[in-house]
C-alpha cells in the first residue's frame, strides 16, 4: 500500500510535544484558497491571547508568487480573516481561520469568489437561502492509485460498496471517522457521511447552512479532510471522474431552499425555481466546476447516476436528472430540491451564488449583473459551453 513517508513517523514522539503547555499564547492557522481555485494553503502565527471574535484576528500576508496568485516582483497578498473555527489538530484554545485573499491593491484575488458571493447573499437575506452540500471524494495512495484497490488490477464491479460494511467492501474508514470527529470539534456544520458507489469513494454532508456560511464551512471541511489524510499518509482527490470506465464519478450535490419553499405550498416555488434553472443550464454548467464545464464533461454523461451535460432535466426521486425533488418533498408539498450538477471540485461560493442569482434575483442568460454599478459582466466569457466541453 502506497502511503507517504511522513505518515510513518512515530506519532507517539509528536504527542509528547503536543501536550506541552503554551501559556496564554494561541496558535492561529490561516487557511485560504490558492490560485488554482481548488487547492487550500495554510500558515500559522502566534497571538498573545485567545481571540473571542473574528475581529480580534489581525490581517496577515503571504507570498502570492508561490501560490499561483502573483508575480515575484509584486508578490505580497493580504489574508483577511472571515470565519473562525476551533483547531482539531492543536486543540483549544488554538484556532483555524478561513480567509479571503486580496491583491496588493486590496482588490479581490481572482479565485476569491467569496467576496462577491457575500454581497449577493446579503442582498437576498430576507429570503433566507439554505444550502446543504454533499461532498464526494476519493482516497488515493500517494502513487495516485485508489486506496485499497489491487496494485495491478481492479476491485469487483460496483454494487456492494455503497454504504457498505466489511473489510472487503470499504477502504479507509479510519480517515472518514477521524475527519467526521475533527469537523464536529471544529464547529463545522457536518451532518453525515457514507461510503459511496465506487470503492474508496466517500461522501460527507455539510448543512443546512444559511447564505455565505455554506462556502465557509465546506471549504474548512475540505481543509480538515486534507490534513487528516496527511496524517494517514493518503490523498483525498476531488477529481469529478478519477477513474475512467464503468465507475461512478464524484459530485457535490447541492440541496437548496428559500423560506417560501419550506412552508406549506412551497412546491410551487420549487417548481418555479427549477423552471428558471432550466432556462440557464449552460451558465450553471460553466460555474459548477473550476474549468468552465471541462471537468464535468467527464462526469455528466447520462450514466452512473448523472444527467447529460447537454440537457436539463428534473424529476421526483430521479438521480439521473439535473434536478431531483426528493420523494418526501413531492408528497408533502414543500421543502427543498437537489441540484446534482456541481462537480466534486466546485467552488461552493460560485455554486451557491449562481443558484441565488438565477432563482431569487431572476438573472437570465450567461451574464451576471454587477449590482454595484448596474453594469453587466460575464463570468461565462472564456469558459467552455457544455456542448464544447464534451470535446476536451
UniProtKB/Swiss-Prot annotation:
Keyword Transmembrane helix: no
Residues noted as binding Mn(2+) 2 in the record, renumbered to the chain: 136, 196, 203
Record domain GS catalytic: where: 113-392
Coiled coil regions in record: none
Cofactor(s) of this protein: Mg(2+); Mn(2+)
Binding site for L-glutamate: 246-247, 319, 340
Record key words, sorted: ATP-binding, Cytoplasm, Endoplasmic reticulum, Ligase, Magnesium, Manganese, Metal-binding, Microsome, Mitochondrion, Nucleotide-binding
EC number: 6.3.1.2
Signal sequence region: none
GO cellular component terms attached to this protein's record: cytoplasm; cytosol; endoplasmic reticulum; mitochondrion
Example of a GO MF term: glutamine synthetase activity
Residues that coordinate or bind Mn(2+) 1: 134, 253, 338
Enzyme class: ligase
Binding-site residues for ADP, renumbered to this chain: 336-338
Subcellular location as annotated: Cytoplasm, Cytosol; Microsome; Mitochondrion
PANTHER family with a match to the protein in the record: GLUTAMINE SYNTHETASE
Protein family membership: Belongs to the glutamine synthetase family.
Role, per record: Glutamine synthetase that catalyzes the ATP-dependent conversion of glutamate and ammonia to glutamine.
Protein name per its UniProtKB record: Glutamine synthetase
Encoding gene (name): glul
Amino acid at each position: 500500500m502506497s502511503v507517504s513517508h511522513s505518515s510513518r513517523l512515530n506519532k507517539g514522539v509528536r504527542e509528547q510535544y503536543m501536550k506541552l503547555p503554551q501559556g496564554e499564547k494561541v496558535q492561529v492557522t490561516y487557511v485560504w484558497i490558492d490560485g488554482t481555485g481548488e487547492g487550500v494553503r495554510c500558515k500559522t502565527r502566534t497571538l498573545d491571547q485567545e481571540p473571542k471574535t473574528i475581529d480580534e484576528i489581525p490581517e496577515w500576508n503571504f507570498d502570492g508568487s508561490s501560490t499561483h496568485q502573483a508575480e515575484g516582483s509584486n508578490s505580497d497578498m493580504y489574508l483577511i480573516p472571515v470565519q473562525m473555527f476551533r483547531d482539531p489538530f492543536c486543540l483549544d484554545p488554538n484556532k483555524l481561520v478561513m480567509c479571503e485573499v486580496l491583491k496588493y491593491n486590496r482588490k479581490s484575488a481572482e479565485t476569491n469568489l467569496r467576496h462577491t458571493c457575500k454581497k449577493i447573499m446579503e442582498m437576498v437575506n430576507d429570503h433566507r437561502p439554505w444550502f446543504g452540500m454533499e461532498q464526494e471524494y476519493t482516497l488515493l495512495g500517494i502513487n495516485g492509485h485508489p486506496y485499497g484497490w489491487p496494485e495491478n488490477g481492479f476491485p469487483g464491479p460496483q454494487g456492494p460498496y455503497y454504504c457498505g460494511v466489511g473489510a472487503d467492501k470499504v477502504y479507509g474508514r479510519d480517515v472518514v471517522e477521524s475527519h467526521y470527529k475533527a469537523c464536529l470539534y471544529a464547529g463545522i456544520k457536518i451532518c453525515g457521511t457514507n461510503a459511496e458507489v465506487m470503492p474508496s469513494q466517500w461522501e460527507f454532508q455539510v448543512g443546512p447552512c444559511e447564505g455565505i456560511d455554506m462556502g465557509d464551512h465546506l471549504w474548512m471541511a475540505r481543509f480538515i479532510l486534507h490534513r487528516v489524510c496527511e496524517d494517514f499518509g493518503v490523498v483525498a482527490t476531488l477529481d469529478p471522474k478519477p477513474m475512467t470506465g464503468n465507475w461512478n464519478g464524484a459530485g457535490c450535490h447541492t440541496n437548496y431552499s428559500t423560506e417560501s419553499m419550506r412552508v406549506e405550498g412551497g412546491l410551487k416555488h420549487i417548481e418555479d425555481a427549477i423552471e428558471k434553472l432550466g432556462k440557464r443550464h449552460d451558465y450553471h454548467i460553466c460555474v459548477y466546476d473550476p474549468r468552465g464545464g471541462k471537468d464535468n464533461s467527464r462526469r455528466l454523461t447520462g450514466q452512473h447516476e448523472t444527467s447529460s451535460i447537454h440537457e436539463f432535466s428534473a424529476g421526483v426521486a430521479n438521480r439521473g436528472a439535473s434536478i431531483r425533488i426528493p420523494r418526501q418533498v413531492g408528497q408533502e408539498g414543500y421543502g427543498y430540491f437537489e441540484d446534482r450538477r456541481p462537480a466534486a471540485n466546485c467552488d461552493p461560493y460560485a455554486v451557491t451564488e449562481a443558484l441565488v442569482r438565477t432563482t431569487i434575483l431572476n438573472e437570465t442568460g450567461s451574464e451576471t449583473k454587477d449590482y454595484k454599478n448596474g453594469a453587466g459582466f460575464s463570468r461565462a466569457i472564456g469558459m467552455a459551453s457544455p456542448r464544447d466541453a464534451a470535446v476536451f
